[in-house]
UniProtKB/Swiss-Prot annotation:
UniProtKB keywords: Cell membrane, Ion channel, Ion transport, Membrane, Metal-binding, Sodium, Transmembrane, Transmembrane helix, Transport
Regulation of its activity: Na(+) is not transported, but it plays an essential structural role and its presence is essential for fluoride channel function.
Family as reported in the entry's similarity comment: Belongs to the fluoride channel Fluc/FEX (TC 1.A.43) family.
TM region positions: 23-43, 52-72, 84-104
GO-annotated biological processes: cellular detoxification of fluoride
Disulfide bonds: none
First-listed, main subcellular location of the protein, grouped into a coarse class: membrane
Membrane topology: Multi-pass membrane protein
Name of the protein: Fluoride-specific ion channel FluC 1
A Pfam family reported for this protein in Swiss-Prot or TrEMBL: CRCB
Catalyzed chemical reaction(s): fluoride(in) = fluoride(out)
Originating species: Desulfitobacterium hafniense (strain Y51)
Listed GO MF terms: fluoride channel activity; metal ion binding
Length: 114
């Protein structure tokens, strides 16, 4: 619930007037980094119960990010004739999400070394 509210606030605060779904893209990329970093560093450093870790990871971060909105926005771009933008959006979302997850794991390893 809190993740979804934060997603909504970011969307209306920074990207309200954009035709391109910058809000969802930004949120999903941040969420990919955050979930990787939380699971590979924070949850190992801070002793939390498995239930609380799951609540934070899949509850907060899961509701912050959104695959369903990405899907609907992609279809809307296609329906509005923005085929190239739709394909770029999907590719950047997928490759960017994987890159940000990788970066989250990498940052975690670097922080653990120091």
């Amino acid at each position: 619930m809190f993740g979804a509210m934060l997603r909504y606030l970011i969307g209306i605060s920074f990207f309200a007037d954009s035709r391109f779904p910058w809000a969802t893209l930004t949120i999903n990329l941040l969420g990919s980094f955050l979930l990787a970093w939380l699971t590979s560093y924070v949850f190992k450093k801070v002793r939390l119960s498995p239930h609380l870790s799951t609540a934070i990871g899949t509850g907060f971060v899961g509701s912050f990010t959104t695959f369903s909105t990405l899907s609907v926005e992609t279809i809307s771009l296609f329906q509005d004739g923005h085929n190239f933008l739709a394909m770029v959006y999907v590719l950047v979302s997928l490759l960017g999400g994987l890159t940000m997850s990788h970066l989250g794991f990498k940052v975690s390893k670097e922080v653990q070394k120091s």
